[in-house]
């Protein structure tokens, strides 16, 4: 039953398009083997079997890790758009997960639940960009400004370095904008 569930998870990624990257990361050799066999049974049953087959053949991976923590490290490197954490205690490993667009915790949270019903949104970083990007959120619609304040003394301490940086870049007016404040 578990390999069928895991296989369906991979299929649901594979049927998106030929460029999809269905990946299973596990620390169980038995599960990896069972999912591989189950994919061969289930893919032909899909209406979009040709797309799913191409996706699995060209971009699909089953990554076998020595332990759960290595599996999480692999997931952080992959930085998937969707990450289904199907372990006994998903909340126990949540703090280790740093790079995923949307994280589905537990065996009762299929991707379709997040896509169509309960997810916070479906605009997620793809192609590993979850390493440096976040899902679309409220912060994307809030205008912000940054603020900077230095005292005359604090600026004086760093002014020579700033001027040096600016001159090395060939931006002499930038350098002068700092040094002019200290001319007599």
For each of these PLM feature ranges, what is it?
Residues 11-17:
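Active-site donor-nucleotide binding/catalytic segment of nucleotide-sugar enzymes
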Residues 9, 34-38, 116-118:
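Short acidic, glycine/serine/threonine-rich loops at helix termini
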Residues 1, 19-21:
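Structured catalytic cores of enzymes that bind and process phosphorylated ligands/cofactors
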Residues 23, 27, 31, 63, ...:
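Catalytic cores of large soluble enzymes that bind and process phosphate-bearing ligands
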Residues 77-184:
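C-terminal core of ALDH-fold dehydrogenases
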Residues 16, 24-100:
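A glycine- and small/hydrophobic-rich beta-loop-beta segment
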Residues 1-8:
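Short, small-residue-biased leader/transition segments that mark boundaries at the very start
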